[in-house]
Amino acid sequence: MEWTPRNQAAFVLAQPRLWWPAVLGEPHLYTMTLEFRGQDGTSVRQSQPFGVRKLETYLSPATHTRVFKVNGRDLYGQGGNWVIDMMLNWTASRYEQEIVAARQANLNFLRIWGPTGAPPDTFYDAADREGVLLQQDFLHDHWGTERNTPGYAPPLEVFEQATTEIIKKYRNHPSLFLWCGGNEGPNPREELITGKLLPTYDPWGTRYYLTASLADGLQGGGPYHNLPAREYFNNPKIAGFNSEIGPSGVPEWESLREFLTLPITQWAPNRFPLDGTWAYHDATDRPGGEGERRKFSLMDNLIQHRYGAPVTTDTAGLRDYAAKAQLLNYETYRAAMEALNAHLWQKSTGFAIWKYNSSWPSVLWQITDWYQRLHAGSYSFRRALEPLHVQFNLDDRTVAVINRTGAPATDLVVQADVFDPGMKSLWHQDQTVGAAQPGANPTAWTVPAQPGLTFLKLRLRHGGEIVSDNFYWLEPGDDFKALAKLPPATVALKLGTAEANGSIPVTVTNQGTGPALLVRLRLIDAPTGVETLPAAWTDNYLNLLPGEKVEVRLHGIPTGLPPHPAIEVSGYNVPASVVTF
């Protein structure tokens, strides 16, 4: 095809393969190559990937909150708030890995949080390839001007030039689906953006302009602190399209020791190990509006009530605290998501977790930390967002099948078992689910309450194959301190042969007589114990019954295997051991 002043050809792509966001389909891309030839013989050639998609949006009659449609299909928004590195020194590979990890977490969009700035092209290119939608907040927004510095605004010509360049930089990316005026308030110069800049530089209507992050069909405001897991199911903010839901997300011990001052010698009264370094890295109590209690001490209270205070006030005690924090992470992140699941499409049309990542070493608000480690809550979060999911609703003790495939699912069987700590069966139930419609599908029974500590194992079979399983520790008063007294579990690993795509299958078996909790796998170098990051696992922090065997896969290792590769396995009640390749 050739364009000349006399021949402005129309570009027609017959029956194109559509670009779909993750969970709805494949993000098909095309490449357009343009070459400009001047009469003097000079030429310039440039290639641009692009995708073909259609975006629509409306307010749900059921929730009165926003719903997005891509290529004619409703999209339940599963998002995260993304922030840039504090020193702006990430490599291109790191930006790409941030996107890949988001898709692996079952997210279909990321919000580039307003004050964080404008990421490089690598970030958007990866989002195009992975099918991760992006919301781009504009700079110099409500937070960056009027809220934090009343009366401040950059010169108009500077703002206009910066905003123009942002629009031109990102407008060709199919992953871009939202422009947003800014964080928690309209942009002070919204009229310039919507009246001049967007109509001039992005007039094609392939994305939507959102006035503010918590307006125009979205809501925000947390909760930003950890709640007891059951309370998420009745919290009024766990509804609508919530743009910021934020449990704490304490990182793993291996990350904590990177930035804490050890040994800890002084700490807040009755709150070991919380000292000034913890506070500096965001473990603070701060006020919040509308009854919001942004207090890290509330998370610490939950750890101490549910799992017990650290056993000692030395480094061993810190490791004990970190292990108990992972138990809390696991139940908290799952509860927040399963509370949304319980109202899927009826009261909820989407969410964005606060936050997806961290811009520096932090002890809260993250599912992937600054070192690219995923804590236990990252995996329970991911599990709760699987296409077909079975869950226990903590508020009314019902069991439900969640279907987010977009189509009815048939030939489903739900199995539920309750055990005491000695693995004695206390209750069993099977039910065939005729057809699980998109959304939440309660079963016909509830799980009876039992005295003391018990374990609930749920399985969902589709065509005879287990497609979802879930494991809960339950106690009427939420006192789980007895977990610390569980006998050590023996877990065996069997490494398979690397497949053509580089994926390595790993079979994990509980060979003990009791449950194995939060079984964690790490790729390490055997002689040094140094962990290889990032390393993507299809699942991790496993909870296994006696004799239970699962297969997970290790894949996505950008740096390649370490010199002497090995897998370390450990868990809350699983002594660490190493299996070499």
Regions found by a protein language model. Give the residues of each.
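Active-site-adjacent substrate/metal-binding segments within catalytic domains
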Residues: P16-W19, G41-W143, Y152-L178, D282, ...
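Secreted/periplasmic carbohydrate-active enzymes, especially glycoside hydrolases
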Residues: M1-R111, A118, L344-S348, R373, ...
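Substrate-binding/catalytic cleft of secreted carbohydrate-active enzymes
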Residues: F109-G288, L328, T332, S348, ...
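A generic secondary-structure signal
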Residues: A101, E165-K169, L197-T200, A335-H343, ...
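Short, flexible, glycine/charge-rich loop motifs used to bind or transfer phosphoryl groups or to couple energy/partner
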Residues: W20, V100, I167-K169, A229-Y232, ...
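Substrate-binding clefts and catalytic carboxylate motifs of secreted carbohydrate-active enzymes
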Residues: F233-T410, Q415, L426
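Long, contiguous hydrophobic alpha-helical segments, chiefly transmembrane helices and signal peptides
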Residues: W19, V52-L55, G77-W82, A102, ...
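Short, well-ordered amphipathic alpha-helices
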Residues: F11-A14, T33, G195-K196, R334-A339
